[in-house]
Amino acid sequence: MPKYRSHTTTHGRNMAGARALWRATGMTDDDFGKPIIAVVNSFTQFVPGHVHLRDLGKLVAEQIVASGGVAKEFNTIAVDDGIAMGHGGMLYSLPSRELIADSVEYMVNAHCADAMVCISNCDKITPGMLMASLRLNIPVIFVSGGPMEAGKTKLSDKIIKLDLIDAMIQGANPNVSDEESAQIERSACPTCGSCSGMFTANSMNCLNEALGLALPGNGSLLATHADRKQLFLDAGKHIVALTKRYYEQDDVSALPRNIANKAAFENAMILDIAMGGSTNTVLHLLAAAQEGEIDFSMTDIDHLSRKVPHLCKVAPSTQKYHMEDVHRAGGVIGILGELDRAGLLNRDVSNVLGLNLTQTLEAYDVMLTQDEGVKQMYAAGPAGIRTTKAFSQDCRYPSLDTDREEGCIRTREHAYSQDGGLAVLYGNIAADGCIVKTAGVDKDSLTFRGPAKVFESQDEAVEAILGGKVVAGDVVVIRYEGPKGGPGMQEMLYPTTYLKSMGLGKSCALLTDGRFSGGTSGLSIGHVSPEAASGGLIGLVQDGDFINIDIPNRGIVLDVSEAELAARRETEEAHGDAAWSPKGRERQVSYALRAYAMLATSADKGAVRDKSKLGG
């Protein structure tokens, strides 16, 4: 029978000092026999996805206490990628994921907590906490802050839905008036919550449902809706039961590595491909799998991407549907239901409720369940009122979207495309692979050939795009923006957005060893591995070189002879210590970022630390 970790600090005369300090936090004699459960919050006033979380940790803690546990809350940092975008702040975004994972490990191990409830929401916070959960392998339940309501505005006598990306595109479009741009800006992000499309934050929160570590509804139920409160209460109640299953019943199936196992990771990736999720999810799933010592790699993702259809199309791939519409159609469980009926899922998986996949679908799939309470939960909709408060409204749709032929979620037979929403491409310029969000690529751009326009930084590329130096047919190559080369693997949302603003969104491609925001669409290929700073071929591309992109056949090739590439490599390596570094780029890089770069692996490994350099 496993021993409660917390007994290390609460039992025995030699722990009198520790108990004295525990008493100073409010614990009593009765508490020293109970499980100590960490409530890992991420409240901050910097991030709309987290601005409403201040009191939600207390809500979870009270339920833990009522269920027989001891709750101790602490906070992690949280970076808003949208606010950090387009300037030096974005260098810190991906490295913050490692800091979050480490800080959770530090706090939980230093104080010998028995289990965790992770209150996450936005881009790097959910992955960082997921990495920590699989690293620690103690009972955990995730409950996120929930999606933002979609913005709405009236243009040309028509009400349209908006999100952050619309504000960015219009802000850079010279043909849009200042008044119209300001109107869109004020309407795009109306409430607290993670940005309303299938961007990185919402993608990861959906994947946590598929991994089995979050409760049904977690990925899609709006942050503002009163129903979301029940998820927090249930998380507090169920974590105590989950903890006791492991420590008092020796039930190892309660541990995250046994819930989020290889089969669950495959299901999560299948979901991601089917819903056209953010390309960042590939990076984060690979990183989390390494923390959990799970054999899940780019090879698995490539295999899955070839057989999974695109069943759910959401912003930024369409303006018609946002997360509130996904929820109305049945949320994550609704998509999983269609994938299961298509015979694409591993059924031998479970979740934190102890339910297997069949039981979960019977209880929560709106196409199967007879539970009116579940149907009512999925009818939860937006109020259209600007607010930063959680659970502030109780509006409902008059009916669910169960149209699986032309609705938000489709059956395999009526899929948006029989090819999934993500693809892994291989070729000489990406020997270890690269990623494209095919859900956002125009059908006419699935094969593309064009001359390279090479830039040593995102900033240089943005200046060229807005300055008219990029023309239709070009392949914009942005290099030395990978985990080491950036450092920090910046998101390239501004270059892709500005290509659209300049009317080039469907006539240019973009290739980078950096990454993209979940809000990116168009022929945007990222995560090129190996990166330029690691000697990758992308570092040898010259202006005018032709690049062939073939998404249907999963290929990407730099059309330059082997002899010429060998000569270029010899020339580059002759620079010695200055080899494989950006030419003429001026960028202030702090010691903290340099430390990250020293240990970072390329994107095909999840951009995690190179354990071989740490003796691991």
UniProtKB/Swiss-Prot annotation:
Cofactor list: [2Fe-2S] cluster; Mg(2+)
EC primary class: lyase
Binding site for Mg(2+): 81, 123-124, 491
Source superkingdom: Bacteria
Protein EC: 4.2.1.9
InterPro entries reported in the protein's UniProt record: Dihydro-acid_dehy_C (IPR042096), DihydroxyA_deHydtase (IPR004404), DiOHA_6PGluconate_deHydtase_CS (IPR020558), ILV_EDD_C (IPR056740), ILV_EDD_N (IPR000581), IlvD/EDD_N (IPR037237)
Pathway: Amino-acid biosynthesis; L-isoleucine biosynthesis; L-isoleucine from 2-oxobutanoate: step 3/4; Amino-acid biosynthesis; L-valine biosynthesis; L-valine from pyruvate: step 3/4
Binding site for [2Fe-2S] cluster: 122, 195
Molecular function terms from GO: 2 iron, 2 sulfur cluster binding; dihydroxy-acid dehydratase activity; hydro-lyase activity; magnesium ion binding
GO cellular component, one term: cytosol
Key words of the record: 2Fe-2S, Amino-acid biosynthesis, Branched-chain amino acid biosynthesis, Iron, Iron-sulfur, Lyase, Magnesium, Metal-binding
GO biological process: isoleucine biosynthetic process; L-valine biosynthetic process
PROSITE patterns: ILVD_EDD_1, ILVD_EDD_2
Active site (catalytic residues): 517 (proton acceptor)
Bound cofactor: record note: Binds 1 [2Fe-2S] cluster per subunit. This cluster acts as a Lewis acid cofactor.
N6-carboxylysine: modified positions: 124
Catalyzed reactions per annotation: (2R)-2,3-dihydroxy-3-methylbutanoate = 3-methyl-2-oxobutanoate + H2O; (2R,3R)-2,3-dihydroxy-3-methylpentanoate = (S)-3-methyl-2-oxopentanoate + H2O
Protein family membership: Belongs to the IlvD/Edd family.
SUBUNIT field: Homodimer.
NCBIfam families (alphabetical): ilvD, PRK12448.1
Protein name, as recorded: Dihydroxy-acid dehydratase
Species of provenance: Yersinia pestis
Lineage per the UniProt record: Bacteria, Pseudomonadati, Pseudomonadota, Gammaproteobacteria, Enterobacterales
